[in-house]
Amino acid sequence: MKLSKYIVIAFITLAITSCGNKAESETVEAATVVANGLANSTFKVWGNCDMCKETIEGSLKVEGVSKADWSTETKMISVAYDTTKITLDQIQKNIAVVGYDNEKYKGDDVTYSELPECCQYDRR
């Protein structure tokens, strides 16, 4: 029951904050819900296509991450992970290492330049 309350509060908070000034900031990290060491986080990762999706999600096929789903439309990734095995910071670094910018880290420049042309996006 307590977990349900936390999830509802997190989603209400997210809904309220995301309805505000969209022009002010493109990078709003969603709330992280943690219960018993398991967390769900949503944040922005720049990319373009299904090849990007495969690479981004593939970078998170590591111990501790049980789900990673990146949307080509919204550029948001939803990640379910075990906080006793991996941190959100490590998750964001893993994505940057394969060449993709996210809210916290810029993708590796050399790796980015080696991405297929369809995967190269306007960098911030």
Predicted regions and their residues:
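C-terminal motif of bacterial Sec signal peptides marking the signal peptidase cleavage site
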Residues: 15-18
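Bacterial N-terminal signal peptides that target proteins for export
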Residues: 1-7
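Conserved short beta-strand edge segments in small beta-sheet-based binding/regulatory domains
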Residues: 99-111
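Short, low-order "capping/linker" segments at domain edges
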Residues: 113-124
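Helix N-cap motif at beta-to-alpha junctions
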Residues: 82-88
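Hydrophobic helical h-region of N-terminal Sec-dependent signal peptides
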Residues: 8-13
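Short, low-complexity, disordered segments immediately C-terminal to signal peptides
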Residues: 20-34
